[in-house]
Amino acid sequence: IPPRAARRSTTSGIADTVLKYGRQRLVLDNHRFIGNVGWRQNEQTYDAFTVVNRSLAQTTVTAGYIYNVNRVFSDESPVGNFRMNSPIFNVKYDGWRAGTLVGYGYLLDFDDLPANSTRTFGLRFAGGMPFGDDLKALYTLEYASQSDYRSNPADFNLNYYLAEGGINTGRFTAKLGYELLSGNGSKAFQTPLATLHAMNGWADGEPAWWLNLQA
């Protein structure tokens, strides 16, 4: 089936479980690893089989198998699709007052871009605690490990770190964060399915001509 001809079906006959097959939107956590690039007119969608189960208290288990990614480009573009064979899982527990704990694994096996094939496992904790009148402390900690997967010709093991702190006043939010995607001189930590513009910071916020003038 051509990627854009995929159909979608949804089943919810199993208690606390939703099954989906075909074209669908996938957004996990803060879009850092799996996102939909939703600000685009043509957002990123996934041809996949997914299972979302909430039978355990305060726990959401998402598991799936992605066989194609419909990127923000047209099907006429040579980079319009990522064909792949990629199992994913994401387990979220939000039963603690202090925050939400997430464990995840994304095993991305690209058919036509083997150098992008990676295996990523990580943990994320994010939350907030009220203090004073209408004030809330915000915090996030995340770590992930990424290595080569399947037909990737490289051999590497890289790390991802995120630490954020902030405050919310009810009307305003201010945050300060540090994010590191490590590299070894030839390979770098990759997140090809992310909502990338949301993560690129100053590198994505300046027009190229201005950067050239500063060089």
Describe the residue ranges of each PLM region.
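Extracellular/periplasmic loop regions
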Residues: I1, L138-A215
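Outer-membrane beta-barrel channel domains
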Residues: I1-R71
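Residues on the lipid-exposed face of transmembrane beta-strands in outer-membrane beta-barrel proteins
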Residues: A5-I14, F49-N53, F89-Y93, L123-G127, ...
